[in-house]
């Protein structure tokens, strides 16, 4: 739960005292995704302080190998109403299926290193997971924020890459990744570096 849970009650009590709030001034917690889970938990843990919570898309129970969100991503990539198509979703699936096979051989790893301009060859199991996770983020974040952030890629944008008939799905994915992720720099897929960044709680 991190530091947010224990800090929350202290902050609420401080605000109540600072502004002379009473029991008629109720607290409602709001959140979506991980913050949504926090809003649900804080209501359960501190019912005497939090009157209610609105927890949107809140994963309050850990599930191993959770694929639910990727199913939502696939559905969005398939939906013309948001800029997707069946061809787009199929090509994305084909690209990842091919990558799964490529990482099993040295020749395939060399191909991935060159196509995706990785900073180092993807060889360890953890670095491979980080690599695939980085690729997945292209689609997950785009679906989550589709048409919400000005200037950010949309589902239509990424599908225009993935449905380019002049290239194969993996090459299209590499071009998309270069555009959205690496932007000319090498692609860092170090599991150790990724974890170090997550553990730095004082980063800006």
What are these regions (language model features)?
Residues 16-22, 51-52:
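Substrate-binding/catalytic groove segments of enzymes
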Residues 41-204:
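Alpha/beta-hydrolase
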Residues 21-34, 38:
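Alpha/beta-hydrolase fold nucleophile elbow
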Residues 15, 37-40:
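Eukaryotic intrinsically disordered and solvent-exposed regulatory patches
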């Amino acid at each position: 739960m991190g530091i947010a849970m224990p800090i929350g009650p202290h902050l609420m009590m401080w605000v109540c005292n600072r502004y002379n709030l009473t029991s008629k001034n109720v607290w409602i917690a709001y959140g979506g995704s991980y913050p949504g889970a926090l809003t649900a938990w804080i209501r359960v843990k501190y019912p005497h302080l939090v009157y209610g919570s609105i927890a949107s898309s809140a994963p309050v129970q850990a599930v191993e190998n959770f694929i639910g969100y990727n199913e939502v991503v696939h559905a969005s990539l398939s939906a013309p109403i948001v800029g997707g198509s069946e061809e787009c979703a199929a090509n994305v699936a084909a690209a990842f299926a091919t990558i799964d096979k490529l990482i099993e051989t040295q020749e395939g790893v060399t191909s991935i290193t060159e196509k995706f301009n990785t900073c180092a060859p993807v060889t360890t199991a953890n670095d491979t997971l980080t690599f695939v996770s980085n690729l997945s983020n292209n689609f997950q974040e785009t679906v989550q924020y589709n048409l919400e952030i000005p200037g950010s890629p949309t589902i239509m944008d990424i599908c225009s890459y993935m449905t380019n008939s002049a290239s194969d799905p993996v090459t299209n994915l590499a071009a998309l990744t270069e555009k959205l992720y690496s932007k000319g720099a090498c692609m860092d897929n170090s599991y150790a570096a990724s974890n170090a960044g997550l553990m730095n709680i004082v980063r800006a």
